[in-house]
């Protein structure tokens, strides 16, 4: 990988992402909101699709919290998946033209998946302070959803 996940207790690194509406978002756009970044290689893999569905269910019960499902997929693919699946509680964001992977230390730099993002979860509070991080050790495994949610309590 290209670095280390943001450290717990520190502020999120500066980043930009692109939404399915092709709008760029940055740290400033998330100020005042709690955020969960569900980071993964591609929406077109079964585990990534499953985590997006599960976080969509979780998002329905969270107050003042936005969940961003982040991958290097083009925004069109992300939007198509959520539209087809009827997922309206999560937001998708693409790292395809940004520094996000490097800033969060999740760019895969070796293996057949070189160039996409590792599977990870980063949770931050309303001020952008990191509450929880998880780098999923096996790319085909799901993240620890409970740990992410419990970090918001």
Report each predicted region and the residues it spans.
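Chalcogenol-based redox active-site neighborhoods
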Residues: 1-153
């Amino acid at each position: 990988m290209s670095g280390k996940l943001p450290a717990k207790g520190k502020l999120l690194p500066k980043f930009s992402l692109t939404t399915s509406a092709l709008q760029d978002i940055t740290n400033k756009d998330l100020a005042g909101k709690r955020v969960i970044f569900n980071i993964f290689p591609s929406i077109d893999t079964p585990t990534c699709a499953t985590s997006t569905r599960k976080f969509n269910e979780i998002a329905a019960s969270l107050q003042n919290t936005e969940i961003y499902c982040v991958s290097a997929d083009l925004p069109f693919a992300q939007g198509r998946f959520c539209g087809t699946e009827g997922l309206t509680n999560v937001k998708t964001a693409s790292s395809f033209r940004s520094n996000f992977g490097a800033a969060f230390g999740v760019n895969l730099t070796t293996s057949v998946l070189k160039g996409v993002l590792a599977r990870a979860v980063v949770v931050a509070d309303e001020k952008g302070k990191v509450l929880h991080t998880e780098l999923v050790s096996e790319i085909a495994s799901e993240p620890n959803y409970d740990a992410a949610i419990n970090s918001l309590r």
